[in-house]
Structures are given as structure tokens and as C-alpha cells.
Amino acid sequence: MLHFNQFVILSAELSHLTPQENEIRTNQLQLMLTKLGFKPTEMIGRYKGDQETSFFVPTTRNDDIERLEFIAFDRFNQESILVQYSDGHSRLHYPNYIEHIGKVREITRQEAFKRDAYTFYPKLGKYYAAI
């Protein structure tokens, strides 16, 4: 995951929806990302203590980030997306502001479970969080 310089992590899920509703939204997001030419990788995320399916999306251009913001905020009503820029620094992008949160780094499972937010890559069995 970290061999990409710039990437976005986003989800379509909302904590107040049913698992079935969130599954539909997740499938819609994956299809939308693929049709737009992105190569999303499915992850398991935790945000504000709630587990959700999220997507790791490598980006090469800043207008890719803007497109992903539009999808997340306008189509799926997301609170934020995580963006790691090519300088290695990560930020949470909200509709009206940006919060600097450090750098995304690999962490242990034990460290992950102590956090309110992390990303798990099932294929590699690795956990990541902004530190």
C-alpha cells in the first residue's frame, strides 16, 4: 500500500444504514470508481469506531483527488476522505476544510484495535493508520 506516493481512501457506507443498504452503496462506489478508470483495492476500515468497507485508490493528479471528493461528498454523503499526498503527509478532506493528520504507516494489529480509525488490507494481512 505505501509504495504508492499519492492515494485516497474512501467509503460509501454510513453508520446509520443497514448492512444491506451499505453493501449496495459499496458496490455502486466500486463500479463508479472502476468506470472512471481508477483501480480501487477493497479494504476494511474503521472510522470513528465503526467498521466499514473502504477503497484504497492510487492517484497521480490533483484533479483525481477533486473527482474523488465529489463522489464521496456529493454522491455518497461522506463526512471525509483520507488523502495521502506525494510528500507523504496525510490529510482528512472534509467538504469545507482539511485536517492534517500525519502520515499513513503500517501498525500492528494490537495498535490498530486501540484506535478509532485504521485500515486493514486483508490480502496482505496488514494494518495502517495515520500517525
Go through the PLM ranges and name each one.
Residues F4-F7, Q51-F55, N77-S80:
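Short, surface-exposed beta-edge/turn micro-motifs
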Residues S11-L17, T60-N62, Q84-H89:
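Short, flexible beta-strand-to-coil junctions
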Residues M1-T41, D50, Y128-I131:
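N-terminal, charge-rich interaction modules
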Residues Q110-I131:
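C-terminal low-complexity, charged extensions that often adopt amphipathic alpha-helices
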Residues R91-R115:
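Short, low-order "capping/linker" segments at domain edges
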Residues K35-I71, R75:
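Short, intrinsically disordered low-complexity segments
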Residues E66-P95:
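Short, compact, well-ordered microdomains
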Residues L33-L36, L82-V83, R105-R109:
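Glycine-rich loops and low-complexity Gly/Arg-rich segments
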